[in-house]
Swiss-Prot record:
S-adenosyl-L-methionine binds at G51, G52, Y53, D70, F97, D118, Q125. Gene3D superfamilies: Putative methyltransferase TM0872, insert domain, Vaccinia Virus protein VP39. The lineage of its organism: Bacteria, Pseudomonadati, Pseudomonadota, Alphaproteobacteria, Hyphomicrobiales. One of its GO terms (biological process) is rRNA base methylation. One of its GO terms (cellular component) is cytoplasm. Pfam families: Methyltransf_5 (PF01795). It catalyses: cytidine(1402) in 16S rRNA + S-adenosyl-L-methionine = N(4)-methylcytidine(1402) in 16S rRNA + S-adenosyl-L-homocysteine + H(+). Belongs to the methyltransferase superfamily. RsmH family. The keyword Chaperone does not apply. Specifically methylates the N4 position of cytidine in position 1402 (C1402) of 16S rRNA. This is Ribosomal RNA small subunit methyltransferase H. It is found in: Cytoplasm. It comes from Methylobacterium radiotolerans (strain ATCC 27329 / DSM 1819 / JCM 2831 / NBRC 15690 / NCIMB 10815 / 0-1). It comes from the Bacteria. Residues 1-23, 276-334 are annotated as: Disordered.
Length: 353
């Protein structure tokens, strides 16, 4: 698998907020198929979307059965044509990929041979103004992948200033999060903030564009709110542990991420589960903890898109693929440190402006 030096990371997944509308193009497609292998059995596409990875897996291995999961009802409806084309080799399950082991159990499937996860928001969601993910086109401030639960508008109009600042700082990595939160509170005293254009304009008034940058000043704020609304990092942590439980020995897990928060979680999960990170300390009661190696690496570090792919699809430029193979070890306890990475810290202080 080819690797290259990473381009500077500039935005959330697929970077669709400030790029012209494009059809959804699966990223690192050949590399994902190669990492997963093609030897029959059952594969799970935990983030079906437009079906790019599912379609490629079905084409690469005529003996493969695929179970695809998505919490977005639009994606499930759009995938019915592919189900019909698959000749009984594809099943679509509505639900969250963090619950993939439970969804598979309900479908009568105990173990699988491959799992692929493509993390974050899809191009289809970004490019639909009515979904409220993007500031490129005005629309309702929604951002919900599953179309239920509190929306971004609910969060923006009801959360207190500290919570908003912490979300924007930790999930959006926006250094001006306090100023953004303060501006939001001042604006909502005059009336509810209901649209993406309203919010983008408010943020642009306090976040300066760096010289030479093409990144919209609201990019990081929108990322932070979207991650919070959909609990994206928590879903990722649950999905990694769920995949660990359902993969047979020799089964493979491939994960594509699009920003540093996601990649950090995947990297630490694979490092811990393959024995490449400390599991204990001689300074703690009981001393070092014996490592249970439930995975062995398939990729050596992240696999990155090449220049040809990023030229065809600029939204791929921040993508990273990591993959590992399940060993015969029993499933260890979930990693509490990953849950902490996916959550707002109890005290987030000192660095926001």
């Amino acid at each position: 698998m080819s690797r290259r030096r990473p381009a500077p990371e500039s935005s959330p997944r697929h970077d669709g907020a400030d790029a012209p509308p494009e059809p959804h193009v699966p990223v690192l497609l050949a590399e994902v198929v190669e990492a997963l292998g093609t030897e029959g059995g059952t594969a799970v596409d935990g983030t079906f979307g437009a079906g790019g990875y599912t379609r490629a897996l079905l084409a690469a291995d005529p003996a493969l059965q695929v179970v695809a999961i998505d919490r977005d009802p639009t994606a499930i409806a759009g995938g019915q044509a592919l189900v019909a084309e698959s000749g009984g080799r594809l099943r679509l399950l509505p639900g969250r990929f963090g619950d993939l082991d439970g969804l598979l159990a309900e479908a009568g499937i105990a173990q699988v041979d491959r799992v692929v996860l493509d993390i974050g928001v899809s191009s289809m969601q970004l490019d639909a103004p009515e979904r409220g993910f993007s500031f490129r086109s005005d629309g309702p401030l929604d951002m919900r992948m599953a179309c239920d639960g509190p929306s971004a508008a609910d969060l923006v109009n009801e959360a207190d200033e500290t919570v908003l600042a912490d979300i924007i700082y930790h999930f959006g990595e926006e250094r001006r999060s306090r100023a953004v939160a303060r501006t939001i509170l001042e604006a909502r005293r005059r009336g509810r903030i209901e649209t993406t254009a309203q919010l983008a304009e408010l943020v642009a008034g306090v976040v300066r564009t760096e010289p030479g940058s093409h990144i919209h000043p609201a990019t990081r704020t929108f990322q932070g709110l979207r991650i919070a609304v959909n609990d994206e990092l928590g879903e990722l942590v649950r999905a990694l542990h769920a995949a660990e439980r359902v993969l047979r020995p020799g089964g493979r897990l491939a994960v594509v991420t699009f920003h540093s928060l996601e990649d950090r979680i995947v990297k630490q999960f694979f490092a811990a589960r393959s024995g490449r990170s400390a599991q204990g300390s001689r300074h703690l009661p009981g001393g070092p903890v014996e490592t249970v190696r439930s995975f062995r690496p398939v990729t050596k570090g992240p696999v990155l898109p090449g220049e040809a792919e990023t030229a065809r699809n600029p939204r791929a430029r921040s993508a990273k693929l990591r993959a590992a193979e399940r060993t015969e070890s029993d499933v260890p306890e979930p990693l509490a440190a990953l849950t902490a990475l996916a959550s707002l810290p109890d005290a987030a202080r000192g660095h926001r402006r």
